[in-house]
Each structure stands twice: as structure tokens, then as C-alpha cells.
């Protein structure tokens, strides 16, 4: 794959979407089954991991080849691919960059091919933006780590076989220096998953209870007690994915559950239906949104700091939802818990976006966290004072 010219790669990608994929998905029902079929076909045709080393199933492609992929796949990726967003977009690049050789050979190819679904066990009831205050505990017992604690806002936990887990392994170290990153098997007795019902009526998120769950001793990413660095690396991959996803969309991609901003093309359709396509104010807002779409696309092509992309994309999502709210018919603003988010949506599609877009500014780090990150790490501004930065975690006051 890496030896193909950009134009030959473009032809191959178009053929895959035009000819191969429709035949692969024909007759397959269900989000997970269709998602697995899509990922397997993508991997088997050498397109799932263009920027990964060949020994892990990748193509070692150039940045220009990756841009060809972004251009040709925009709006054509099946909605079922969201099942693999955490695994392919976050867990796999973190393991690729920081995992041991054993972990790379065990997890990269199956994850990229869609044979295994991943979730991310980060946030806790008392540890969201201040993630380093987490209290889930991991203790070594022979050849296994024993993990006890609670996680929350976990996307896709009910459907996952594996998880990236952050747990505290040294309570006497300062809070950032006593954390370890693990790969946790989800399908075991010590893991309980409970769905959280959102105001949209669906349950994308879960809370996860860990009661003496077991992790093999060597399933550590990075160093023991050195998990903060890979944790930040994974968050950067998450923000990169959030900041650069395709926004041109097609009708088939409408039901990506509000994860992408409403494309301008769909807002134009809505304006036409509302009889306001020639409204001067609406035209001005749509022009702004079109500019925003292009900015997000170019940010992805340039590979800028992940926080910049995420800030732009979530801003675009809120602005698009506001325009939709001003245009939608009464039925378009309604959303019922019994509506099926897995199907193509019409009027109710806009209602879901309007309800869901604010949450996209929170996931992966709030807008305020992104601005702090940019100020400190990109602009070199002074860090916010942290009175607990060098205090042993066991000495910090915590809620009972």
C-alpha cells in the first residue's frame, strides 16, 4: 500500500467504497455485525491502518496518502464505524506509540480489524476534569493486578471486550505520579456495567463497577506509576479524532448520534423546507458554518494541536444546532425516548442534535480544559497554581 502513488491510492479507495463495501454489507443486520464486517473488509484491503508499521497490519503511508484517505472517505464511512471509535481512534494509537512489543502484537491487528471492541475507563464520580484525583485502586497479586473502583460516562462499555483503564497504584506518590494505565478484560465476573439514560432517551454512556477485577501483570501501557503520560497521549488522540472527523456527511451518516456537527448541506435542505433559504440572516449563518466546515477540514490536514481541532469542532456543532433550532418545524425539535437512534433520521434527527451537541463540548475535556492546555503547552503561558501537585495523594482531603 505504501508503494502506491496518491492517485493510485485514490482509485483503490473509490473502488473499495463503490464496489467492495456494498457487497460486503449486503444482507448483514445490526450495528455491531455491520461494523465488524466493515472494519474487517477495510483491514483486509489494506486501508484500515495506513499510518501503522507493516508488521502490525499497517501500510506505512505518507502524510499525503492519509490526506487522500480523508478526502475520499469523507461522508462515506458507515455509521456503524462509531462502535470502534475508542479502539481505533484512541486505544490503538496509544498502544502503537507506548505499548510493549507483546501488547502491540496482541492487540493492534485485532483492534484495527474490528475483532475486538474497546472502551475507555477514565472518569469517576469524583474525578472528571481533575482526572488525576481518581481513586480506583490496582494492587499486584502474583501474576495479576486486582482492580476495585467505579468509573462513569463510559461510552460503549456494554458492548466492549477490552478497556483502557487508569487506576491508582501508589497512594503515597503525588496524584499525577501514582497512576498506571492498564488493558482490562471487560468480560469477567468482577466487571458490572450499568447504562445511563441521557435526556435524548438513549444510553450511549455507562457506569462501570470494578470489584476485584483481574488484569494480567504485563498488560500495562508505559510504566507502573507512570500512567499519566500515556493518559495524556490518549486524550490527545481523542481530541484529534473529535476535532477532525468528517463533517460533509451524507444522508446515510445522519444517525451518527449527534457526534458530528450538522453538515451545512443538511441545514440548506432544512432551510428549503422551512421556506427560508433566501432569508438574509439564515444565509449569513450558513456562510459562517460553511467557513467553519472548511476550517475543521484544514486543521485536520495540517495536524495542528488536538485541542485546537476539538475546540473548533464543538463550536461548529453548537452553532449548527442553533441554526437548526431556528429553522426546524415543531416536529423537528421533538425527540422521544422510543425513537431509534440507529436508523436514518428525518425531522427528529435535528432534535437529537440540538439536545446532544452541548455534551460534545464536555466529552474528551471541556472547552475550558482545552484552552488551559493550549495556553500552557502551546503558548508557554504560566501553569495554573496547583497546591496539591507535590503532595502525597494519601494526604489529600477527599470526599468520604
Which residue stretches match the model-derived regions?
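A structural signal for short hydrophobic beta-strand segments in well-ordered beta-sheet cores
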Residues: 136-139
Amino acid at each position: 500500500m505504501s508503494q502506491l502513488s496518491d492517485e493510485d491510492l485514490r482509485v483503490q479507495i473509490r473502488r473499495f467504497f463503490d464496489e467492495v463495501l456494498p457487497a460486503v454489507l449486503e444482507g448483514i443486520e445490526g450495528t455491531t455485525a455491520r461494523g465488524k464486517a466493515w472494519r474487517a473488509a477495510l483491514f483486509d484491503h489494506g486501508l484500515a491502518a495506513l499510518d501503522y508499521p507493516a508488521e502490525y497490519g499497517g501500510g506505512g503511508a505518507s502524510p499525503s496518502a492519509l490526506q487522500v484517505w480523508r478526502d475520499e472517505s469523507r461522508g462515506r464511512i458507515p455509521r456503524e464505524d462509531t462502535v470502534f471509535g475508542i479502539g481505533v481512534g484512541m486505544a490503538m494509537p496509544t498502544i502503537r506509540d507506548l505499548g510493549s512489543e507483546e501488547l502491540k502484537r496482541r492487540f493492534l491487528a485485532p483492534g484495527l480489524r474490528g475483532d475486538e471492541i474497546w472502551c475507555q475507563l477514565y472518569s469517576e464520580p469524583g474525578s472528571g476534569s481533575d482526572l488525576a484525583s481518581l481513586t480506583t485502586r490496582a494492587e499486584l497479586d502474583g501474576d495479576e493486578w486486582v482492580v476495585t473502583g467505579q468509573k462513569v460516562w463510559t461510552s460503549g462499555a456494554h458492548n466492549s471486550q477490552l478497556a483502557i483503564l487508569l487506576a491508582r497504584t501508589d497512594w503515597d506518590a503525588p496524584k499525577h505520579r501514582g497512576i498506571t494505565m492498564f488493558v482490562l478484560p471487560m468480560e469477567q465476573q468482577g466487571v458490572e456495567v450499568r447504562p445511563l439514560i441521557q435526556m435524548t432517551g438513549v444510553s450511549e454512556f455507562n457506569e462501570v463497577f470494578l470489584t476485584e477485577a483481574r488484569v494480567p501483570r504485563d498488560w500495562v501501557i508505559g510504566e507502573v506509576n507512570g500512567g499519566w503520560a500515556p493518559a495524556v497521549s490518549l486524550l490527545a488522540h481523542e481530541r484529534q479524532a473529535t476535532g477532525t472527523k468528517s463533517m460533509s456527511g451524507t444522508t446515510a451518516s445522519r444517525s451518527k448520534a449527534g457526534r458530528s456537527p450538522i453538515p451545512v448541506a443538511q441545514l440548506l435542505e432544512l432551510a428549503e423546507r422551512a421556506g427560508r433559504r433566501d432569508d438574509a440572516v439564515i444565509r449569513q449563518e450558513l456562510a459562517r458554518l460553511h467557513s467553519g466546515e472548511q476550517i475543521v477540514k484544514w486543521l485536520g490536514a495540517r495536524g495542528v494541536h488536538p485541542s485546537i481541532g476539538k475546540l473548533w469542532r464543538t463550536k461548529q456543532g453548537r452553532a449548527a444546532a442553533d441554526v437548526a433550532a431556528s429553522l426546524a418545524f415543531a416536529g423537528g425539535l421533538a425527540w422521544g425516548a422510543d425513537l431509534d437512534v440507529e436508523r436514518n433520521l428525518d425531522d427528529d434527527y435535528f432534535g437529537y442534535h440540538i439536545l446532544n451537541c452541548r455534551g460534545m463540548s464536555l466529552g474528551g475535556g471541556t472547552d475550558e480544559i482545552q484552552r488551559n492546555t493550549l495556553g500552557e503547552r502551546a503558548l508557554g503561558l504560566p501553569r495554573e497554581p496547583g497546591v496539591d501537585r507535590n503532595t502525597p495523594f494519601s494526604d489529600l482531603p477527599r470526599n468520604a
